[in-house]
Amino acid sequence: MDKDEFSRQARDATQSLYRVACAYLASPPDRDDAVQEALLRAWEKRRTLREEQYFKTWLTRILIRV
């Protein structure tokens, strides 16, 4: 997955990530930090994603583990 494709898919998933973060974290700054950390980890591990069609699911799992 190249930089542009990652950026596009991450942008498309951002609203969903914030909804998940709201379910796990009460503090808005903590939510922001968790989403940002998940995006950073996803970028660093992007080569481990086996099928791009599951990007959003994969990214959500990363967020939950942050």
Model-predicted segments: where are they?
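Short alpha-helix-to-loop micro-motif enriched in aromatics/charged/Gly
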Residues: 47-51
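Structural recognition of an alpha-helix C-terminal capping motif at a helix-to-coil junction
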Residues: 19, 33-40, 53-65
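A short, charge-rich alpha-helical start-of-domain segment used by transcription regulators
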Residues: 1-19, 23, 29-32, 43
